[in-house]
Every structure is written in structure tokens, then in C-alpha cells.
Amino acid sequence: FEHTDRNIFKIVNQLEIVGQEKRIPDGIVYVNGLPVVVMEFKSAVKEDTTIMNAFTQLTVRYRRDIPNLFHYNAFVVISDGVNNKYGTLFTPYDFFYAWRKVESTDKSNDGIDSLLTMVEGLFRRERLLSVLKDFVFFPDNSKGEQKMVCRNPQFFATHLLYENILGHSHINIKGDGKGGTYFGATGCGKSMTMLFLTRMLMRSRHLASPTIVLITDRTDLDDQLAAQFVNAKLFVGDETIINVETRKELGELLRGRKSGGVFLTTIHKFSEDINLLSDRANIICISDEAHRSQTNISQNISITDKGVKRSYGFAKYLHDSLPNATYVGFTGTPID
């Protein structure tokens, strides 16, 4: 993966494959002899064939008749020349998506030019290797029937956040701990982006086995995120993925920890009496809905008949307890 030029990339058109039946996929992408992508194309001008026919041909006929072709498959592509989508062999049709950008700063591209956008944006050699390395997810309990591949916003966001975290981490002399904020609308797959980012961080040689703290501000969100992450230990690369239930447990897990671990908790567990949990620099705090939980670090003063009362938001206690951590925010609401 580190040396793109040491890999052999081939695309083969109309290769006859004999299994239960003889099938002829329109295109197969090979990396070092392994068939990692299978493509099926239909014509946009023929009324009797559609992109849905391409989907059925791949996920039903080819899967049934030439299953050996998919032993090393990462994802499949369906196209009618105008509509161009990709997904895994187990992805429902409604969740096949186009790759709409070549670079993260480009405008989304649909229509006739979108096939070229997919080729340049997804099949560039180093881009394809990156997807194969970090962006194809098998849940731990999938039993081979579940597999997910990133969408292009998740891919770009993960890489941008990863590079920003490395640049701003306190492992650097001039690091300020500002890992960045990701804005994504509801339904854009923020939790999967968090998962892809966590995998890249845990595998980073620069961060040397970091500890990841995932923070939400509601118990139901915490439970949802925990269910996903606890089922991704192989993907993340760490057996210690724990949904933290109490402040006491949070302290026991973080104090004295030298490396590793992914801990999910709510912001409310960080209170005035939490004190210092760790001064390590390779701790990454990732907050979901950060506009609600990470903007209240200033002091609030209220005057009552009992005198002046000073208080802070939970975010202040979080930063005090992990002073050298790098902080990353995910939100569906734009914040400054």
C-alpha cells in the first residue's frame, strides 16, 4: 500500500468464467492478480435493459453461478453510461451510490460525465489502494453476508480529518489540539466516517497506538454508536472497545492507560470532580453533535440571593481532564 508503483493493475474486458454456468462480466479490475472489482455495463438507449439489470446480473446471477470470482472482491460497479454507481455484493440497490467528485473541493458531477468522474476519482491507483486498505468494512458478526464500502464524502472527510489531526496533535511541538470539525447533513453516514477515521488513527505509526474517546450528548446516540463500534473490533484493530457506563468506570479505564483502547461515553460523565484523567498527547476525542456539547467551555456567572455562582459547561471539564488530547467534532449544524 505504501508503494503504489510496486503493484500491478489490470482491467480485463469480457473474460469468460466457467462455474455453475459460463458467465462473461463486462469488466474486472485486478490488483496483483486478485479480482477486486467487477463491473457490469448496460446501454442507456436500450429500453429493455437498465442499470437495475446490471445490478441483478452481478448480485444474483454472477454471485450464484461464478462465486469464486468474488472471493477477493471489494466492490462492484453498475453503469448504463449515464447513471454510474458502486456498492458491495451485499449492498441493496437503493444504497448503491455514484462517486461524484475527483477531488474533495470539486463540485458534484452527475450525468454523462459521471463515469469519467468515477474512473478518475475512485480508480486512480493510489485512491483505489486506499479504499481497499481502510474503507471496506466487514462487521465482526457479519458471517460473510455484510460488507460496506465508503461513499466519496466519507472517504474525503476521513482523509482530511486524519491529516488535520496529525498536524494539530500535541505530539507536535506546535500542536494546538484542534483536530477539526466535520459538517454533514442527516443521513450522510457520519457514524461510518467516525469508524473509518478511528481505523486510520489506530493504525497510524505517527500516533503510536492512540486512545480514542467517542463522545455523544444523549444516551440513545451513545448506544447506537456503541453497537456499531463494538461490532467492529477486527476492523478497528483493537479488542478494547467499551461503552463506558459510569464516571468511576471512565476514570478506571483512562487513568494510567499507556496506549490503545476505544471508549464510548456521554459528555455528562465529565463533571467538576472528574479531575485529570490523562496528560498523554496521543488521545483523540471525537464528539458527535459537537455543536451541542463542545461549545460550552466558557464560565457562566449567576447572581442569586445566596451570592455569586460560577459554573462551566461539560466541555470545559472534558478539556481539563484530557488537556493534551486532540479534539474532533462531527455535527449536522454548522458552527464557527
List where the protein language model places each region.
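ATP-dependent helicase/translocase motor core
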Residues: F1-T211, D220-V236, K258, V262, ...
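Short acidic, S/G/P-rich loop/turn micro-motifs used as interaction or catalytic elements
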Residues: A44-K46, K269-S271, S293
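Signature of the SF2 helicase/ATPase Hel1-core->accessory helical subdomain module
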Residues: I51, Y97, E272, S278-D336
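A short beta-strand-to-loop transition that corresponds to the Sensor-1 phosphate-sensing loop
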Residues: G81-V82, R218, T265-K269, E289, ...
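Hydrophobic positions in the central parallel beta-sheet of the AAA+
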Residues: L214, V262-T265, C285
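Conserved helicase motor
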Residues: T219, I241-G251, T266-E272
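Conserved motor-coupling elements within RecA-like helicase/translocase cores
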Residues: V244-F263, L276-R280
